[in-house]
Amino acid sequence: PKYTIVDKETCIACGACGAAAPDIYDYDEDGIAYVTLDDNQGIVEVPDILIDDMMDAFEGCPTDSIKVADEPFDGDPNKFE
């Protein structure tokens, strides 16, 4: 399984992740990205059909704010750093 979360502290609201993976990432009122699957907690497995989109977003993030892991983040984007 794969999990994803956005580090809102480093996100610059560029819009790249939502363009790459609109079924996973959306934006708050300030344009800061978050994961829609679990309100950015990183605890819901990303469906297999969305893994390619997620990896495109992960690789395309200019600030490395998109985090991906094999275990849940439990709400902490820096859990595995």
From Swiss-Prot:
Positions that bind [4Fe-4S] cluster: C11, C14, C17, C61
Pfam families, per database record: Fer4_13
Keywords carried by this UniProt record: 4Fe-4S, Electron transport, Iron, Iron-sulfur, Metal-binding, Transport
Cystine bridges: none
PROSITE patterns for this protein: 4FE4S_FER_2
Record domain 4Fe-4S ferredoxin-type: where: 2-30
Protein name per UniProt: Ferredoxin
Species whose genome carries this gene: Bacillus thermoproteolyticus
Lineage: Bacteria, Bacillati, Bacillota, Bacilli, Bacillales
